[in-house]
Amino acid sequence: MPWLHDADVLLVDGGDATYLAHWMRESGLVHLVPSMPETVWVGVSAGSMVMTPRIGDYFVEWAAAPNDRTLGIVDFSIFPHLDYPGWPGNTLAKARTWAAKIGGPAYAIDDQTAITVVDDLVEVVSEGHWEQFRL
């Protein structure tokens, strides 16, 4: 996939993170990501969640998903769309319950928040609401 190596940025939008992880494995994309250290991965919703080790059962929607495991390229999990209007299940209380079950470091972030990972440096960039869980 030469075009992939020529890309400066990959924008990966939402959906189901387990489905996305499945097809990233099937297509071989998961093996290409580490060979592209200069390429910026911009994940939106499931596009970010797919890079984490787990998404938690709360976010698994794909019926064929064997579990809640995703790619584990970063070492933390993400609860997206915190306090999103019209999504009554995405509260901070739900995020705390989710984080207690995830078994590792995690972040709950709203739609005005991003997490950057450069090498081993993780930073939160936000004009909104977020919380870090260290479990």
Language-model-detected regions and their locations in the chain:
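Class I SAM-dependent methyltransferase SAM-binding "motif I" and its flanking Rossmann-like core
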Residues: 12-88
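A short, aliphatic-rich alpha-helical micro-motif
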Residues: 4-5
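C-terminal and late-domain segments of enzyme folds
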Residues: 9, 55-135
